[in-house]
Structures are given as structure tokens and as C-alpha cells.
Amino acid sequence: MALRIGVLCGGRSAEREVSLRSGEAVYQALMAAGYNDVVKIDVGYDLVEQLKGNEIQVAFLALHGKYGEDGTIQGLLEMLDIPYTGSGVLASALAINKIATKKIFKMEGIPTPAFSVITKKEVEDKSLQEAALRAIKEVGVPAVVKANTQGSTIGITFVHVKEKMAEAIESALKYDQDVLVEQFVAGTEVTASVLGNNSPEALPLIEITSVTGVYDYQSKYTPGMSDHIIPPRLPQDIQEKIKELAIKSFLSLGCRGLGRIDFIIRDNQPYALEVNTLPGMTATSLFPDAANYAGISFPELTDRLIKLALEQ
């Protein structure tokens, strides 16, 4: 196919190595799908020169974390008039902002765990202890304290007892001006992959379980401590409800192309946690795994994502 595709990967975020693996997998899949003119680009300060020099006609984003899924690279590509895979500037910026995402969930009537917002200014104007007491009053313990716009492994603390709340907030404030304190909901974790633009579809759900048999947030964020079960061990009507909420979440933020929405299910009630606009794209990642179960091979998936990018 006479279309020059640039696979953008690497970058400067803490998830650089994962992004490089995603980039290589996507490169191979696009070639297998029949795209013969594909260039891998390690994103750096010379990105504009690389895009222009290689005469890139469409960008496949295999980036993760800061500068990749926060709207930054999307804005640059918009200025250069280069179509790209995944969500646009606003949806990307909203999805990486955990607090903004939670507020949108609340406005749209999408169930989500209770939360409290702590700002650096509040801590400076009042005190760390006062902010911690407010979070405990509004959310309670156990809770998860998260830096607002960091990746899932950075600036996160699981708080079991009230006495540790202030310390967790202080730690998160090292990474961000705003902190999300979220109620911990024990239950089954399920991730929903969504594919499409204006009329997206939810792919088969994947249940994520702890290898130790005890589910908690730490299991979620520790590599090698979780297994993927597809389809999840949930009643069919609950699975359909999760898919509906996933599509609603996707559209509420204005996402397009692809996205992955994480849920916790307790007593058959799904709670939306967050939206990932650029999920991992190695052949064994969650999103391609869900697509594969739906009968969409990895090469076919990359082809569909390119076509969705060109629809915009």
C-alpha cells in the first residue's frame, strides 16, 4: 500500500522501553498487513525534522506516558497536518488527568469510587495534616493516593491506615501539583477495550487476577503478579453493562480510535477507574489480546487503526 507510515515510539517518559517494544511489534504487524512503507521513529527533539524528512503521511502512536498520551504529541501532529492513531488533543489531556476523568465520570452518571482532591496550594495554605484529615473524612481507608497526571506506577501509595495518609499525600505531591485520593474498592478487576470513532465497539472483556489470590492495587501495579482471564468470570448481563459503561466513558471524554477502560466490579456493580488512550500494543498486551479473542489478528488490528486515523 502506497502510504508512508511513521511508527512513533520510545520518547522521554519512564515507559520508554515498553514503548520501544510496542513500536517494534506494531512495525512488524503493519508490514504483515501489507503496508510496505513503514518507518520506525524514536521520538526525540528532532521529531519534526524526522517527520518531514521521512515525508510521513500518517503516524501510528506507540508511545506511553508523558509527551505521548497527554495531548502534547497530538497537538504537534495537528499543527503539521499529519493524521495519527488514537484520541485527539483534548481527550488525551483529559484522560491522563485522573481528577478531570473522575469528574466527567461523575457528571455523566458513570459509577466510580468515591474520591477527594488535594492540591499543593491547600497543603501550603493550611497544613498537610489538615488536608489528610479531609481526605480521610471524604474517602476513608483503605484508599489509593495517586499523583494526578503520572503513569500508573509513579506517585501511587496504597493507604491501609489513617496514620499513613499524610505521608502518602506528601509523596504524591513530589510528582504533581494535584493529588487524587480514591476509595479502595475490593472486587474483580476487568479491563474493557474499545475500538472505533463515532460508533465504537467494545471488544471482549479481560479479567485481571492476582497471582497470590489476594486482589489489591499493589497486585495491579506489580509486573508478574497478575493473570489475564478472557472472557471474565462474570454473568453475561454484567459483562454487557461493563461494555456499555466503557463505550459511554470513551465517548464522554471524546476519545477516538482506541482506548482501554479499567473497572472494579463489586457485588455485580462495575466502577470505572480510568481511561487509557494509548494502551500497550505488543502482541501480548491487553488490547491486542482482546481483539484477537474477537477474531481480529494483530496485523488486522493495526490496519483498522490506520483506517480509523484516516477517517478524521
Swiss-Prot record:
The gene is ddl. Cell wall formation. HAMAP family: Dala_Dala_lig (MF_00047). Binds 2 magnesium or manganese ions per subunit. Mg(2+) 2 binds at E274, N276. It is found in: Cytoplasm. GO terms for biological process: cell wall organization; peptidoglycan biosynthetic process; regulation of cell shape. It catalyses: 2 D-alanine + ATP = D-alanyl-D-alanine + ADP + phosphate + H(+). ATP binds at residues 136-191. This is D-alanine--D-alanine ligase. PANTHER family: D-ALANINE--D-ALANINE LIGASE (PTHR23132), D-ALANINE--D-ALANINE LIGASE B (PTHR23132:SF23). It comes from Desulforamulus reducens (strain ATCC BAA-1160 / DSM 100696 / MI-1) (Desulfotomaculum reducens). GO terms for cellular component: cytoplasm. PROSITE patterns: ATP_GRASP, DALA_DALA_LIGASE_1, DALA_DALA_LIGASE_2. SMART domains: GARS_A. Mg(2+) 1 binds at D262, E274. It comes from the Bacteria. Its cofactor is Mg(2+); Mn(2+). Belongs to the D-alanine--D-alanine ligase family.
